[in-house]
């Protein structure tokens, strides 16, 4: 098969499965509204859970940082790209989350890839929740370790894998909040099984940090768990981008020596680190935002209970409505868009076959009447 035939076949398969992805150009898509051209939509697809991408203090911190440090870092942190705002942010994150060290990465994808590939060897094994994020599963697949997956949120399934012999080390991988279902992992049971087997636990809490736990410390704090490796991202509740890995001192030093995604990537702009410090302060003091978000979640779930679609068992800002059929899911999303509501249709391979859904995400930036409007239109198009 030629290169062109391979490309054509792949595109044809996505079209035939009603799974073809397209990007939409917009003029702003965070917080409450999404603007595209002259059309404005209520935005129920953003991960900006607390609306901090539009926060005046966060924006001002970025502007002031850019005036002081410029708009780029100029290189890898191992060369000239590690500045005072980076060091300050790392220390603030470590103090807040109760770890000796934090290391900044340009994205959560890069952080997960770096940790899994740098820490594991051929005689090690990675035991990952079956529905872990693509960045985790891809990194585990490409790592030298053996990958085995346990049934989603099933500690007993994990235990069966832990019972099997391994000549090297075991790293168990899961998420605090899963991005497509919005459900939470039973972290205490998972950590108990992992520790009893002498393994380490990595938790990716991209969707829990900032919105769950005391002062927004996330899923691990909420469940009383402290994994050996905690990955947090800044593209959700923080309203920006980037990520960090929280760990012990020797692990941080090891990653600085061996994590290629860290060593060979240009560091985030110092101005971004300044903005992240401002976002962190707002999150630490943000019980009002978390309470407001929880009110919107409760309001939506109460109103959506009567819909003919299955509502996912989620207590978080991610509220999936399961449809099943790809074409029907796309059609529903288009009807919502025609009514001024931006809701994303999620289809395989992002979710398992037959798992197509409307992935609704809520934000503290939403007003109560926004939720009422969403429910009104959903009831209209689903009945």
From Swiss-Prot:
Q: Does the keyword Cell cycle apply?
A: no
Protein residues bound to pyridoxal 5'-phosphate: 108-109, 179, 207, 233
- Name a single GO biological process: biotin biosynthetic process
Pathway noted in the entry: Cofactor biosynthesis; biotin biosynthesis
Q: Which reaction does it catalyse?
A: 6-carboxyhexanoyl-[ACP] + L-alanine + H(+) = (8S)-8-amino-7-oxononanoate + holo-[ACP] + CO2
Where does the chain bind substrate? 21, 133, 350
MF-aspect GO terms: 8-amino-7-oxononanoate synthase activity; pyridoxal phosphate binding
Q: State the UniProt keywords alphabetically.
A: Biotin biosynthesis, Pyridoxal phosphate, Transferase
Required co-factors: pyridoxal 5'-phosphate
- N6-(pyridoxal phosphate)lysine PTM positions: 236
Note the Pfam families from the entry.
Aminotran_1_2 (PF00155)
Q: Which InterPro entries match?
A: Aminotrans_II_pyridoxalP_BS, Aminotransferase_I/II_large, AON_synthase_class-II, AONS_Archaea/Proteobacteria, AONS_Proteobacteria, PyrdxlP-dep_Trfase, PyrdxlP-dep_Trfase_major, PyrdxlP-dep_Trfase_small
- State the EC number(s): 2.3.1.47
Q: Which domain of life is it from?
A: Bacteria
Q: What class of enzyme is it?
A: transferase
Q: Which SUPFAM superfamilies match?
A: PLP-dependent transferases
How is the quaternary structure described?
Homodimer.
> Per the similarity annotation, which family is this?
Belongs to the class-II pyridoxal-phosphate-dependent aminotransferase family. BioF subfamily.
What's the stated role of this polypeptide? Catalyzes the decarboxylative condensation of pimeloyl-[acyl-carrier protein] and L-alanine to produce 8-amino-7-oxononanoate (AON), [acyl-carrier protein], and carbon dioxide.
Quote the protein name from its UniProt record: 8-amino-7-oxononanoate synthase
**Species name for this entry?**
Yersinia enterocolitica serotype O:8 / biotype 1B (strain NCTC 13174 / 8081)
Q: Which gene encodes it?
A: bioF
